[in-house]
Amino acid sequence: MNLFRFLGDLSHLLAIILLLLKIWKSRSCAGISGKSQVLFAVVFTARYLDLFTNYISLYNTCMKVVYIACSFTTVWMIYSKFKATYDGNHDTFRVEFLVVPTAVLAFLVNHDFTPLEILWTFSIYLESVAILPQLFMVSKTGEAETITSHYLFALGVYRTLYLFNWIWRYHFEGFFDLIAIVAGLVQTVLYCDFFYLYITKVLKGKKLSLPA
């Protein structure tokens, strides 16, 4: 494992922990898109079904379990534990516009037409756009809490580091995965505007608010 992959995993884990702590400490999921969190739970479930059939390393297995457990814990908090604080009025993105196209694309463009490989490919495609309901929610409310901004920034850093991971692997290992790279680029592009706002506002102690 190279440094970019490791730092990317840490950034991803940090994002998840920040979100869980935000919800638990505030006893509220206000400002958090439940739809994005459901999509992430679907992503990790589809991607890590090989948990029972393919052992790579203890680190790899532990991270898979953590991602799945945390994603479903987050969904449970939003739709059950703190349901009264969930802002469903602003969380209105039509997720079928993300799930259906990525599922169809996974059947058409994949590395190997087997159930686990199709599910893995579907998870890669879906993850690249799973944050859209959250970004859409922020655009509707016009602002985001600081801790939510930190969560989104950590996710963006995770994807950016993974792009460097792919470059590293291609250069030193000759490994090239076009599906993962293109999906990663799409996901990183979606964060670009947010990165700018985060750097110019949140890091200066201001609340992230979108231009009118």
Swiss-Prot record:
It is a multi-pass membrane protein. Residues 25-32, 80-92, 136-149, 200-212 are cytoplasmic. The record marks R5, E117 as: Interaction with the K-D-E-L motif on target proteins. Residues 47-48, 159-169 are annotated as: Interaction with the K-D-E-L motif on target proteins. Phosphorylation by PKA at Ser-209 is required for endoplasmic reticulum retention function. GO terms for molecular function: ER retention sequence binding; KDEL sequence binding. InterPro entries: ER_ret_rcpt (IPR000133). Keywords: Cytoplasmic vesicle, Endoplasmic reticulum, ER-Golgi transport, Golgi apparatus, Membrane, Phosphoprotein, Protein transport, Receptor, Transmembrane, Transmembrane helix, Transport. It is found in: Golgi apparatus membrane; Cytoplasmic vesicle, COPI-coated vesicle membrane; Endoplasmic reticulum membrane; Endoplasmic reticulum-Golgi intermediate compartment membrane. One of its GO terms (cellular component) is endoplasmic reticulum-Golgi intermediate compartment. Residues 1-4, 53-58, 111-116, 169-178 are lumenal. Residues 204-207 are annotated as: Important for recycling of cargo proteins with the sequence motif K-D-E-L from the Golgi to the endoplasmic reticulum. Receptor for the C-terminal sequence motif K-D-E-L that is present on endoplasmic reticulum resident proteins and that mediates their recycling from the Golgi back to the endoplasmic reticulum. Upon ligand binding the receptor oligomerizes and interacts with components of the transport machinery such as ARFGAP1 and ARF1. This is ER lumen protein-retaining receptor 1. It comes from Rattus norvegicus (Rat). The gene is Kdelr1.
